[in-house]
Swiss-Prot record:
This is Feruloyl CoA ortho-hydroxylase F6H1-1. One of its GO terms (molecular function) is 2-oxoglutarate-dependent dioxygenase activity. Keywords: Dioxygenase, Iron, Metal-binding, Oxidoreductase. Its cofactor is L-ascorbate; Fe(2+).
Amino acid sequence: MPAVLSSVLSNITDFVVHEGNGVKGLADMGLEALPKQYVQPEEERITTSTVIVDDTIPVIDLSEWGSDPKVGDMNCEAAEKWGFFQIVNHGVPLEVLEEVKAATYRFFRLPAEEKNKHSKDNSPSNNVRYGTSFTPHAEKALEWKDFLSLFYVSDEEAAALWPSACRDEALTFMRNCDAVIKRLLKSLMKGLNVTEIDGTKESLLMGSKRINMNYYPKCPNPELTVGVGRHSDVSTLTILLQDQIGGLYVRKLDSDEWVHVPPINGAIVINVGDALQILSNGRYKSIEHRVIANGSNNRISVPIFVNPRPNDVIGPLPELLESGEKAVYKNVLYSDYVKHFFRKAHDGKETVDFAKIN
């Protein structure tokens, strides 16, 4: 083993986390075996025995949304029964999708010292964060992923703080998704018989946004690790753009079986987050999902997390309780909920139980 590689493997946390090389830095060294720090327990790896190959999440064509009320009904049904669905003919131009994917590659191809300017130790703002894995300090086994996380405050702050390699494309993607986000949330509220979205509800549903750029390098021994471990999102909705490589798996409702989310050119994946599960009193389901590592290809994805504001209190919507439903969840300060999620390793649906009424 070359001396440089031997030195890196003996100080992986420094190389990957503190020096900003990420797992891309490891992959670029041509590793032939997965470092032990990334070997996941067997129960956290996906196996062929737990995957259903002839089933997948719904694909909903939005082209007739304005004229066919069934389209809105299909969105609500998918949110209830799957918590995940893909949308096509959504109005976001294909070139916008392609440009933000290209910008993601452009950022991660920057030298490590350039990317590391945005790390937890070096970034001038908590709203811009480059990192690796999920919570390296809390994980027994690391995840095979690097990421850039950008919390949106204003165009002015983005212009000042977001990396120039991907800033404009990230903002354009977010802006182009705004109309479909609002329409989806309005449709999902209608399914709960909530007909008016006032200022308070608008804040609860979409008061803040974060866009991530995820990079999953080609991996030696991909069957021993994960790109992302089992989790559900803390958002109201997540709007996900994935590339053509594949690897996203979703747990079927009330099952231990998983289905693959096949890439569809031009499609956007939508999933319900914990905040919407709580607001809907459990009607809409925030579902566990995970990403496998790939031994042949690099993979990217670009999620937009649509969230309440940090100082919002989330709980079942009053309209649901007024109609006689019993509250399944207590009221929780959203920032407390998010802190609970980020202080530990990925652990399936444990976070939403934090808000359950016992």
